[in-house]
UniProtKB/Swiss-Prot annotation:
Record GO biological process: protein unfolding; proteolysis involved in protein catabolic process
Organism per entry: Leptospira interrogans serogroup Icterohaemorrhagiae serovar Lai (strain 56601)
Stored Pfam families: AAA_2, AAA_5
CDD domains in the cross-refs: RecA-like_HslU (cd19498)
Keyword Chaperone applies: yes
Phylogenetic placement of the source organism: Bacteria, Pseudomonadati, Spirochaetota, Spirochaetia, Leptospirales
One GO MF term: ATP binding
The protein's name in its UniProt record: ATP-dependent protease ATPase subunit HslU
Family: Belongs to the ClpX chaperone family. HslU subfamily.
Length: 479
């Protein structure tokens, strides 16, 4: 293995020793209500920390307890899993169960979700490594660019783009004087580079071509059940075909960025990154399997339900523990945490095949959102919807202010609409706020300065939404 200028240990992000109570508190910052679901995922995450502290023999025997969340759309199922993955810096993949077909049918097989998770893990580790070496890469990129702009006589490693107007000291006889003059000129160029005075200049860089694994012509094998063949072909051709550099003409800021990426790639130890990515996907990976209820066949049904049952049977070995070949090597799925979710309007969890039910031992029912929950969703989270709209419109100089009675009226309308029509949970708030703020969002940039302060109170909400609410047919399609 080649020696690398920087050989930093790649480890997972500093995982805090969070207790289940602390995990729930962090989830509370972003998600309203759903205490039972938060407790279940908090315990699952804490058990991973506990497992790491055991001796290797016992550690191998302890498997994650997969979770199935039951509840209507828009109550926080996906958000809980997403926030959980951010807490532990784990590779996280959200997939829809309906996208997969059983082996033998046209479409993606369930093993492809593990391959996708492996790619996510690899990218996560690479990004963390690049962050660690960012300063070093910037310094090296700056020196490389200066070598191009003002090279030593006969030296130009990356490309051409020498800027004229600076003496190359051919007229200076003394070698020491020439060197001093060159260094002074180089520092002068460095100052111009840092202050942006060279941003309009163009340079020609000799940069590595994208690897053959990224060549689009091979993606014909990317569909269906041929992912393994695709990976093998790309890996083989990547080793056989020579890697060539490509000359590109770029402006200074773009050239600097390209060189930074190139230098960071040189500092990267591929074997170490691959090992860490493999460890993380096996030990920390989380797969959120949404719409699990859509592959549950109802009793007495036939036809398409046969294929649905096939997908369930294909899921069994993946959830239980299997080995899947991926781009980063064979991945064991034994300790990947699976969180399934579904509304189960037309079906119930018992409609899943018994073997799959047994592999999701923890079941959590999420509560329907109340009017008070809607009020909290609008105001409590640090990035609540009201704060998002205030920030967006402030870029046009519009000062948006939501009063308490305005918040209460929006929450009441959202709750009533969910009761009268389809219950889409908190997503109803997005629809209502877009309709409510449509006028100010459109007219805002053209308003005079005196009219750029807009107060959203109960009367404002009623005036703009009353007509739509009263018309049942209209409210069904607009709100």
């Amino acid at each position: 293995m080649a020696n690398h200028p920087i050989d930093q240990e790649l480890t997972s992000p500093a995982e805090e020793e969070l207790t289940p109570r602390e995990i729930v508190a962090k989830l509370d910052e972003h998600i309203i209500s759903q205490k039972n679901a938060k407790k279940a995922v908090a315990i699952a995450l804490r058990n991973r920390t506990r497992r790491k502290k055991l001796d290797p023999e016992m550690r191998e025997e302890i498997y994650p307890k997969n979770i199935i969340m039951i509840g209507p759309t828009g109550v926080g199922k996906t958000e809980i899993a997403r926030r959980l993955s951010k807490l532990c810096g784990a590779p996280f993949l959200k997939v829809e169960a309906t996208k997969y077909t059983e082996v033998g049918y046209v479409g993606r097989d369930v093993e492809s979700m593990i391959r996708d998770l492996a790619v996510i893990s690899m990218n996560l580790v690479k990004q963390e490594f690049r962050t660690k070496v960012e300063e070093t890469a910037k310094q090296k990129a700056e020196e490389a660019l200066l070598d191009i702009l003002l090279p030593f006589p006969g030296e130009n490693k990356h490309g051409s783009g020498q800027i004229t107007g600076f003496a190359t000291s051919s007229t200076l006889a003394d070698e020491e004087d020439r060197k001093t003059h060159f260094l002074e000129t180089r520092e002068f160029m460095r100052k111009k580079l840092k202050t942006g005075k060279l941003d309009d200049q163009e340079v020609e860089l000799d940069l590595p071509n994208p690897s053959v694994s990224q060549v689009p012509m091979l993606q014909v094998f990317g569909a269906g059940n041929l992912d393994d063949l695709d990976n093998q072909l790309q890996n083989v051709l990547g080793d056989i075909l020579p890697k060539k550099n490509k000359k590109r003409k770029l402006k200074i800021p773009e050239a600097l960025k390209a060189l930074e990426e190139s230098e960071a790639e040189k500092l990267l130890d591929p074997d170490k990154v691959q090992r860490e990515a493999l460890r993380r996907v096996e030990e920390m990976g989380i797969i959120f399997l949404d719409e699990i209820d859509k592959i549950a066949g109802r009793e007495g049904k036939s036809g398409a339900d046969v294929s649905r049952e096939g997908v369930q049977r294909d899921l069994l070995p993946i959830v239980e523990g299997a080995t899947v070949n991926t781009k980063i090597g064979p991945v064991k799925t034994d300790h990947i945490l699976f969180i399934a979710a579904g509304a189960f309007h037309m079906t119930k969890p018992s409609d899943l095949i018994p073997e799959l039910q047994g592999r999701f031992p923890i079941r959590v029912e999420l509560e329907k959102l109340s009017r008070e929950d809607f009020e909290k969703i609008l105001t409590a989270p640090c990035s609540s919807l009201t704060r998002q709209y205030e920030a967006l419109l402030s870029t046009d100089g519009i000062q948006l202010e939501f009063s308490l009675d305005g918040i209460q009226e929006i929450a009441r309308i959202a709750y009533d609409m969910n009761e009268k029509h389809e219950n889409i949970g908190a997503r109803r708030l997005n629809t209502i706020l877009e309709r409510l703020l449509e006028e100010v969002s459109f007219e805002g940039p053209d308003l005079p300065e005196s009219q750029r302060k807009v107060r959203i109170d109960g009367k404002y909400v009623t005036d703009r939404l009353q007509g739509v609410i009263q018309n049942k047919d209209l409210s069904q399609y607009i709100l």
